[in-house]
UniProtKB/Swiss-Prot annotation:
Pfam families: Kunitz_BPTI (PF00014). It is found in: Secreted. It comes from the Eukaryota. It comes from Olivierus martensii. SMART domains: KU. Belongs to the venom Kunitz-type family. Scorpion delta-Ktx subfamily. Delta-Ktx 3 sub-subfamily. Disulfide bonds join 26-76, 35-59, 51-72, 73-81. This is Kunitz-type serine protease inhibitor BmKTT-2. Its main location: secreted. One of its GO terms (molecular function) is potassium channel regulator activity.
Length: 81
């Protein structure tokens, strides 16, 4: 029974990772969005060729928006960060 649960967990993790990666467009500029919160996030700066910090307002924006620099690197510049 534990093996079945482990396999199901692995499959769900893979499916979630694949679906997250599909909607990311690393060519978009950073986009704060319309809200007024102050969240430090990371975006891939295509001109600079690296992930950089920006302030996210908490809503809207675009898919070039990551919680960590590591997440940004994995999605947009694997092997370079």
């Amino acid at each position: 029974m534990m093996n079945v649960i482990t396999v199901v967990g692995i499959i769900l993790s893979v499916v979630c990772t694949i679906s997250d990666a599909e909607g990311v467009d690393c060519t978009l500029p950073s986009d704060t969005g319309r809200c007024k919160a102050y969240f430090i996030r990371y975006f891939y700066n295509q001109k600079a060729g690296e992930c950089q910090k920006f302030v996210y307002g908490g809503c809207e924006g675009n898919s070039n928006n990551f919680l960590t620099k590591s997440d940004c690197c994995k999605q947009c510049s694997p092997g370079k960060c």
